[in-house]
Amino acid sequence: MTMLFEPFEFSGMRLKNRIVSVPVVSNLATEDGFVTDSLVERYRKIAEGGAAWIIIEDVVVISRKSPFNLRIWDDQFIPGLRKLTDTVHDVEGVKIGIQLGHFLKISMKGYRQRVEDLTLEEIKQIIEDHLQAALRSKKAGFDSIEWDAESCMTLSQFLSRQNKRKDEYGGSLENRLRIVMEIYQVTREALGKEFVLGVRINGDDLVMGGNTLLHSTEIAKRLAEAEVDYLSISCGGQWEDALPPKAGEPPSAYTGYSGLRCWPRAWDPDGANVYLSDGIRKAVRKAGYSVPVITSGKIPMPDLAEEILREGKADLIGLGRPLLCDPDWVRKALEGREEEIVRCIYCNHCSEVNDLFQTTDCIQWPKCSVNAPSPYLPKHKVSIEMEGLHEKERV
């Protein structure tokens, strides 16, 4: 598996292999958004498990309430985040990035703010919030910054063809891209060319009237032309096809078809979303750009990851749920112990509890565990009933 474990260098950042821990919200922060020991422990395990680059979960750039999400809207959050980056950097050769996110207002009663509702003053504040968060990220010791412009997040809603604003922030592709470009430009000016800046976008919104792969390749080419350092590809996760929440539960953008495709399930084919990174990578290469592309979406085992790289469908392999399930996935693969990998079964228990703002855990861990056990070997199998019931069975 030569390519998977080859070093990879771009924009002055050297990775010891091509495996990236992509953002999965843990809900291990305090209710006010501060780093906890359990959260640090989760990322320490992933770092020690061999991933070259950890991009931590969506860190919110505004003070708007959202329980147990990490925050960075004020300097008071820097010390905790510094503790996290120092812990990861203690593991030789591991880089740590931060994903910055912004969301619009939504209520339990069904109200959902849209980008069309925002004033120009509010848009300028969103740009400023992202800039200040980026400055704090550098102070906290992160090696890279990623803007969350996928799924249901604010920047994704601006990029979508469903953005019907009548001013310079809506309508045409250039206008829909404007807020992302302005955030990138002011941040690049503030942090310099040496700091790694990337964007995570949808390859396909998977809803009527949203962006398709055709539109996303054009977005990717514009971002590559602007010299972003990397692109990370996701899909779906839109409000437009989300189901109404059950009584007493918070609304979620991941309950409709687009949400199910954002987190491919057990019945989806392995590598279900890789065609999106493949299409985008081919398009940006054809346009003359060499920007690295991260793929993700149901890549359970090393052999598929290696195949994706060898076939040129991505430059880096993003793992979310597999590293949540087994943080030692990379080390076991590197040492030829693939049979010891505790394989993610894609039951999406983690996604379901995440939607309820509960601690994101794995059904294969011992009961009541906050993080994966260590050492961790596959001692049981897990059966999945189609009704959504999960049951451990000893072998």
Where do the language-model regions lie?
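Flavin-dependent oxidoreductase catalytic cores
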Residues: 1-395
